């Protein structure tokens, strides 16, 4: 037990999950720009839904990075206020919820044969969904 107490705490470990998840969502959202009605039609989605998907992916990626900066001491002591931490926590949770909604829609549109097909063969979307769910449930208290 003494050995475990000697291991230093790495309080910035949430960045190891936050950065790759944000990059994937930013990359997917930016790759859809400029979006058009033809893009939405190719996925058989209404234009408004496609608009929310594109800006949701970009916003969730930016929100996840920005909220991490808001709750860390990277931002500096002058904005290290209580309400900034709460706002950062809410932004993290909202970004996670948006990620879960978008990935759920992607899985739904792919029309898998069963739940097990998603779990066994759609690993990327399962990991993106679980990553979004992690931040939605934990917020910035990681």
Task: Cite the ranges covered by each PLM segment.
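Extended, low-polarity transmembrane helix blocks
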Residues: 1-34, 38, 48-142
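Short, structured beta-strand/loop micro-motifs enriched in basic residues and often containing a Trp
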Residues: 43-47
